[in-house]
């Protein structure tokens, strides 16, 4: 049997796989120790629709945060440029890894962290929301210092969705998944040769 080896240079798949493994272990620890709290029942469909829409809105908010300084400096708006790890042709494995990684992050930063802060530290809800968003933002510092500010905004949206849904991590996870999948599909053409993009547009 040949060992499973990730494609060379496939950062997206590698990072998502490591996220699922590490965050999955942390979540399991939180569940086993009871520090993460109990899973909330699923809310109404309207919250899921709102969460999916806010996933796309998050992309817009992060773009505005990055674009305004450039607009002020250059006098023109830049194009939306997702992280380079999203570039490439469509892969079902990458697609599933994006879903799994976003869900794993939400389990840790919302279910585990907010639940842990509330249950173990007995901190106020607003502090749990801020800390969860802050540490989620720091988790993306490898994208650059400015990305921390962008992810703080997204993190606040995820945390507020989690709280407003009564603690249902499924709602914040859907929002997170929709945001990442939007960026992934938006970037697919940018991973193709120029001739292919021109042919697809005709």
Outline where the language-model segments fall:
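Cytosolic-side membrane-entry/anchor segment at the start of a transmembrane helix
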Residues: 1-23
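Juxtamembrane helix-loop-helix connectors linking adjacent transmembrane helices
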Residues: 5-7, 31-101, 114-120, 193-202
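A ubiquitous, low-specificity "background" feature that marks scattered single residues
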Residues: 21-22, 29, 64, 68, ...
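Alpha-helical transmembrane segments of multipass membrane proteins
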Residues: 22, 26, 53-62, 158, ...
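Transmembrane helix-loop-helix hairpins at the membrane interface
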Residues: 86-202
């Amino acid at each position: 049997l040949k060992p499973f080896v990730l494609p060379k240079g496939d950062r997206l798949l590698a990072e998502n796989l490591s996220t699922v493994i590490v965050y999955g272990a942390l979540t399991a620890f939180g569940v086993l120790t009871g520090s993460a709290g109990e899973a909330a029942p699923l809310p109404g469909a309207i919250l899921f629709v709102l969460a999916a829409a806010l996933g796309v809105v998050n992309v817009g908010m992060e773009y505005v945060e990055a674009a305004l300084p450039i607009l002020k400096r250059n006098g023109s708006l830049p194009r939306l440029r997702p992280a380079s790890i999203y570039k490439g042709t469509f892969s079902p494995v990458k697609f599933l890894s994006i879903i799994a990684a976003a869900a794993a992050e939400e389990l840790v930063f919302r279910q585990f962290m907010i639940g842990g802060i509330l249950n173990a530290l007995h901190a106020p809800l607003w502090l749990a929301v801020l800390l969860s968003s802050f540490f989620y933002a720091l988790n993306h510092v490898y994208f650059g210092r400015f990305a921390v500010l962008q992810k703080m905004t997204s993190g606040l949206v995820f945390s507020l969705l989690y709280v407003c849904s009564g603690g249902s991590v499924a709602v914040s996870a859907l929002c997170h998944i929709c945001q990442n999948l939007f960026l992934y599909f938006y970037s697919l053409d940018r991973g193709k040769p120029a001739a292919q993009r021109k042919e697809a547009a005709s």
